Amino acid sequence: MGALQGIRVLDLSRVLAGPWCGQILADLGAEVIKIERPRVGDDTRMWGPPWMPDQDGNMTRESGYFQCTNRNKYSVAVDITTSEGQALIYEIAKTADVVIENYKTGSLAKYSLDYASLSELNPNIVYCSITGFGQDGPRAEEPGYDFIIQGMSGLMSITGEPDDVAGGGAQKVGVAVVDIQTGLYSTIAIQAALIARSHTGRGQYIDMSLLDVQVAALANQGMNYLASGKAPQRMGNQHPSIVPYQTFKAKDKEFIIACGNDKQFKDLCIAIDYPELLENEKFVRNQDRVKYRDELIPLLSKHFLQKTAKEWVDMIHALKVPVGVINSIEDALAEPQIVHRNLVVNIPHRLNENFQTIGSPIKLSDTPVEYHHAPPELGEHTAQILSRFKTVEELATLKEKGIIDGKIA
């Protein structure tokens, strides 16, 4: 039994932030009904290549992007722009606990699928809206995309090498981190609202903004500015407040050292056979190492050119100083620790019984995550869900009219 068994989610979202939230809820046992456009589906279904191979190794038209964020969901293809399609959504909403949507602010009101409309049908509903900029403010009605928000929020100003270094300049993060974080925060907010409902008997509205989330997630960098009045700058792979905490080039390739305290730095110097560094008062305390970073780092950089990355990692790891390699994704998924933790899971797909995906990191002792089904084909569950309140004949008529899509019988 999943932790959220018995919770029904009407998922009107698409692309990443909303679907990421929905997938987490589904992994935890909620019934997540994903509404998609007939014959088209979620935009990310076409965000390929790469495409998922079928059982024989032939490429399907199921994108890797869609597969990463839609497992354990039920796909129902309904045209919500029509009155008949809206009526179908109302029927689902009547018994839903949660609604997730990420349309532009105000867009769903014209279809009477906004919070005001659905909460009249079901006052217990928890309704989560995810937008780029929130429901109010001067930019509320604008669409928001992860890349744009990474720039606006200040994240890109602290990501990448300084301008005066080769290859320097603002960089986005390698995954859509704002969307993913917003999905996580939305999941937390939804679960909080469900707990509140158990006390008050009422649902509520949740207003989530990508920009809000990423500004909140500036964490120490945002606080550093508020504390000092100085805007943090791009430092490549270095840390603004801890030294040494960065990548270093060995004889063959780069590796990472992350000394979080003075004892770890002392142990590092012992591990790499460089005790002379400890005789210099400039390097004993972290606050001084930060101040004299430009003296310490060149010394370490020169020293690390003497051996391979593996040799250094093994030596440093032996004294329990945080150290690591820089893996490709291929190497990361083959990492023994990742394999042991079962992060790559097999879920039979209708097109490929050997379908693999990256699983949930959540490990619950009593109500573990379960993988009931792979990401669905478009409209795969239309008949299964809508037959709860429509006959096969009625569904066939709706399909003929283009209101719904998917196999009916």
Describe each model-derived feature in a short phrase.
Residues 1-189, 193-199, 377, 383-409:
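N-terminal helix-loop segment corresponding to the beta1-alpha1 unit
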Residues 39, 133-134, 210-215, 252, ...:
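Glycine-rich beta-alpha junction loops
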Residues 135, 165-176, 198-214, 233-240, ...:
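Conserved Rossmann-fold dehydrogenase catalytic segment
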Residues 161, 183-203, 216-227, 269-276:
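Oxidoreductase and adenylate-handling cofactor-binding alpha/beta cores
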Residues 168-178, 249-253, 367-370:
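Flexible glycine/proline-enriched surface loops and loop-helix/loop-strand junctions
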Residues 243-319, 323, 395:
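Aromatic-enriched alpha-helical interface/lid elements that frame and gate functional surfaces
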Residues 284, 352-401:
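Flexible, small-/acidic-enriched active-site or ligand-binding loops
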Residues 318-372:
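A glycine-rich dinucleotide-binding beta-alpha-beta segment and adjacent secondary-structure elements
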